[in-house]
């Protein structure tokens, strides 16, 4: 096939989630060099390196002629590149190659869940515009969560999530659900106020969270809306189904236990102050402002059914 791009850059972390990173890079490179006339691989050694590279592209007026960016990693790593692209107004399409435990947004893009097949999928992909969440000053592709999601992440101790993958995460979930910690919330959503007690709040752009699919067909990461979910304290069995990757659920099964509020801007206050999980990274505390930025980024997307492992 003829290359579609002049110069592509692939970013990766040494600890990207692939067991044998250099073998994985070789497989990915075979595919991406078919897409790009010139192809550069860039190791990110420290947090913030990817954003600095994006800043350099802007500062140098993109003198290297880069016209596509790729990222190998999980959702948190992907967000590093998304933040760099948006903060420095690069206006470049991004190709995502899964390299973490769940890679939720890669599923939204109809990509395979493994790096090698996903890089082959990108040969069939085309850029499509997607919304992006903004949580305080951070851009986020997929979700922000408060309560049980943070408890769950903190229960996955040390390296266990990387070593044992989904099994470790699910076992942690079962532990978390047996000991939920309720909190009080005040949500100011587009001029309306909601108050109450819950064990979990979820703010979602994508349709996959922690490997499971939110069973709401009309959800779309390109509709200009943020999806706010307030979980009933008595819906522990429902939460277990969602976290345990049960794909057969329908919204009618859970709508009595979860309030869904389409929104654009949300101000979140909790009592006591709570940690906030942003695509698997716990970096903020309430209160926080969350908004949706419509059509903010171009991501390489495959038509449904074309992915190698579908």
Question: What is each model feature region?
Answer:
Residues 145, 202-215, 282:
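Glycine-rich phosphate/pyrophosphate-binding beta-alpha loops
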Residues 76-92:
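Short Gly/Thr/Asp-enriched flexible loops that form oxyanion-binding sites at enzyme active sites
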Residues 1-69, 79, 84, 306-310:
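ATP/NTP phosphate-donor binding region
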Residues 14, 72-74, 99:
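Glycine-rich beta-strand-to-loop/alpha-helix junction loops that act as flexible
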Residues 21, 189, 195, 220, ...:
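ATP/nucleoside-binding phosphotransfer catalytic cores, i.e., glycine-rich phosphate-binding loops
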Residues 160-168, 217-237:
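Gly/Ser/Thr-rich active-site loops/lids in small-molecule metabolic enzymes
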Residues 35, 87-199:
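Catalytic core of DAGKc-family lipid kinases
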């Amino acid at each position: 096939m003829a290359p579609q791009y002049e110069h592509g850059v692939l970013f990766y972390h040494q600890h990207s989630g692939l067991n044998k990173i250099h073998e994985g890079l070789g497989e990915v490179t075979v595919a991406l060099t078919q897409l790009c006339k010139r192809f550069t691989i860039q190791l990110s050694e420290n947090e913030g390196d990817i954003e600095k590279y994006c800043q350099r592209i802007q500062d140098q007026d993109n003198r290297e002629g880069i016209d596509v960016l790729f990222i190998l990693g999980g959702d948190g790593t992907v967000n590093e590149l998304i933040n760099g692209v948006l903060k420095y107004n690069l206006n470049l399409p991004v190709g995502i190659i899964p390299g973490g435990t769940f890679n939720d947004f890669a599923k939204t893009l109809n990509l395979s869940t493994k790096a090698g097949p996903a890089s082959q999928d990108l040969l069939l992909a085309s850029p499509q515009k997607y919304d992006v969440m903004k949580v305080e000053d951070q851009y986020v592709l997929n979700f922000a969560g408060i309560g049980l999601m943070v408890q769950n992440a903190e229960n996955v101790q040390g390296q266990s999530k990387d070593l044992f993958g989904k099994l470790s995460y699910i076992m942690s979930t079962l532990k978390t659900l047996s000991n939920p910690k309720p909190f009080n919330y005040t949500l100011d959503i587009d001029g309306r106020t909601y108050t109450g007690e819950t064990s979990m709040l979820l703010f979602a752009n994508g349709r996959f969270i922690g490997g499971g699919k939110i069973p709401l067909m009309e959800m779309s990461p390109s509709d200009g809306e943020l999806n706010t979910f307030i979980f009933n304290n008595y819906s522990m069995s429902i939460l277990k189904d969602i976290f345990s990757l049960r794909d057969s659920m329908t919204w009618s099964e859970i709508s009595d236990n979860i309030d869904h509020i389409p929104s654009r801007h949300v101000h979140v206050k909790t009592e006591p102050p709570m940690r906030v999980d942003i695509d698997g990274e716990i970096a903020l505390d309430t209160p926080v402002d969350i908004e949706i930025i419509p059509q903010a980024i171009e991501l390489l997307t495959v038509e449904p059914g074309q992915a190698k492992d579908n």
